[in-house]
């Protein structure tokens, strides 16, 4: 065994006895100081390091580790991504569980497709509005408290919506669901960008968005299958109960913020933050990208049920609900492409994912069901990949007021859902699926042009963003 190393400190006269190997001693010094100094000539293997480590070095190391980023492969990383996975699951399950029941609502309340789409659009509109408030609130109060409160409130409002018989009351509860969910949607991306090591942010964001995809799929799938056997009221209660379970898991396992620093809620400060983001060369384009991508995605899933329930397909509500399994492609693509973007760069990846969306949607314009379903799958794969890349780009691009930047991105994202989702109903009534097709293709071409514009964007100093 190697002999213990000892050396008398030049500064304090104390003797530090090192009982570890020389390698351990060197690693300790590196941890304390970040790197080896090249300014002091090294005359021996021990002397320079003994001079650099003061008696309080251990305290400094502990303080530094306390503020460190969460690294991939650590238990903290697994807890974080699992918690945000559950949060994303609950958010999208609560938000999009109403899509399969839109045809049933049209029949029960004697309303057309555009009016029925309000049950989703009112939620996403209130969510978009809430994003402008909850993001800055989290900058002051902290990330985790806002997200936990948001999930529990949204789950309870969903349960309440299943107990109300009138259309206006249902819309009111759905508005409360959207407003509540803004607390998680606005903050989750910011939490990840603050706590996860920058080298792994793409993977972490991809896993969070995978939770979104599973939530959206599960909400649609459970609702679509259940309403063939029970009332949509009962199905809504089941969705709300599952969301309560997910909210509890989220609350228990999400680590507290370690790198959060509270900032002012002064209106002038908030306005300065918004102005700063819109003056950035890239962020406004990312906000527009979110609007176009989400508008196209929600429009397809809002009205595909109307097409497949009618002639010549005449599919049952349960079978249409099962088509939500195409979300599995999004679960894979969000994590895989997010990690790929970390390696190859977001400029190279974003536009390619939109081309995939276009290719998938073109397949849905044909009549055979065996082309429609693969088209939906490819379209979904491309959408979640694009969203993963664009959303992780926000955290890298915004140098200050990251919560506000995330809020503006998601405001645009859900504004696209509300506006395009309802506007699609008019195209459906004007031209059927071909009318929907022209609308979605226009949105995707716009998204592709924005992505190509972003590909030419000059990166920030010392960042690939």
Specify the residue positions occupied by each region the protein language model found:
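C-terminal transmembrane helical hairpin of 12-TM major facilitator-type secondary transporters
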Residues: 347-390
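C-terminal membrane-cytosol helix-exit motif in multi-pass small-molecule transporters
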Residues: 241-260, 450-454
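Juxtamembrane intracellular "pre-TM" segments in multi-pass secondary transporters
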Residues: 69-74, 255-287
């Amino acid at each position: 065994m190697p002999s213990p190393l000892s050396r008398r400190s030049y500064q304090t006269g104390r003797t530090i006895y090192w009982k570890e190997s020389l390698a351990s001693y060197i690693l300790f010094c590196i941890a304390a100081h970040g790197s080896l100094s090249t300014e002091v000539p090294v005359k021996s293997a021990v002397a320079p390091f003994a001079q650099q480590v003061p008696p309080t070095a251990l305290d400094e190391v502990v303080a530094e580790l306390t503020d460190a980023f969460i690294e991939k492969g650590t238990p903290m990383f697994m807890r974080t991504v699992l918690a945000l996975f559950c949060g994303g699951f609950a958010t999208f399950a609560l938000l999009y569980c109403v899509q399969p029941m839109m045809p049933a609502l049209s029949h029960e309340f004697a309303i057309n497709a555009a009016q029925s789409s309000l049950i989703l659009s009112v939620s996403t509109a209130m969510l978009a509005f809430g994003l402008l408030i909850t993001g800055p609130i989290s900058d002051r109060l902290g990330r985790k408290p806002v997200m936990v409160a948001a999930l529990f409130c949204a789950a309870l409002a969903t349960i309440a919506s299943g107990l109300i018989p009138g259309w206006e009351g249902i819309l009111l509860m759905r508005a409360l669901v959207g407003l509540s969910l803004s607390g998680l949607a606005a903050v989750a991306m910011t939490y990840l960008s603050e706590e996860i090591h920058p080298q792994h942010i793409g993977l972490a964001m991809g896993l969070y968005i995978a939770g979104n995809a599973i939530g959206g799929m599960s909400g649609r799938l459970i609702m679509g299958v259940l309403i063939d056997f029970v009332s949509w009221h009962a199905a809504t209660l089941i969705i709300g109960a599952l969301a309560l379970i997910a909210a509890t898991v989220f609350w228990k396992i999400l680590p507290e913020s370690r790198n959060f620093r509270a900032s002012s809620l002064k209106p002038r400060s908030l306005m300065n933050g918004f102005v700063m983001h819109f003056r950035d060369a890239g962020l406004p384009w990312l906000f527009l990208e979110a609007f176009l991508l989400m508008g196209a995605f929600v429009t397809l899933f809002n009205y595909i049920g109307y097409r497949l329930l009618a002639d010549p397909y005449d599919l049952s509500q349960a079978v249409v609900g099962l088509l939500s399994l195409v979300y599995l492609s999004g679960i894979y693509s969000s994590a895989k492409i997010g990690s790929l973007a970390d390696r190859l760069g977001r400029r190279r990846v974003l536009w390619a994912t939109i081309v995939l969306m276009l290719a998938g949607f073109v397949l849905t314009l044909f009549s055979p069901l065996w082309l429609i379903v693969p088209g939906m799958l490819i379209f979904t794969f491309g959408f979640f990949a694009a969203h993963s890349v664009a959303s992780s780009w926000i955290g890298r691009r915004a140098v200050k007021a990251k919560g506000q930047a995330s809020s503006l991105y998601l405001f645009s994202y859900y504004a696209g859902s509300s506006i395009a989702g309802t506007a699609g109903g008019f195209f459906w009534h004007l031209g059927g699926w071909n009318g929907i097709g022209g609308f979605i293709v226009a949105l995707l071409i716009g998204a592709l042009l924005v992505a190509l514009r972003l590909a030419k964007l000059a990166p920030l100093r010392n960042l690939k963003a």
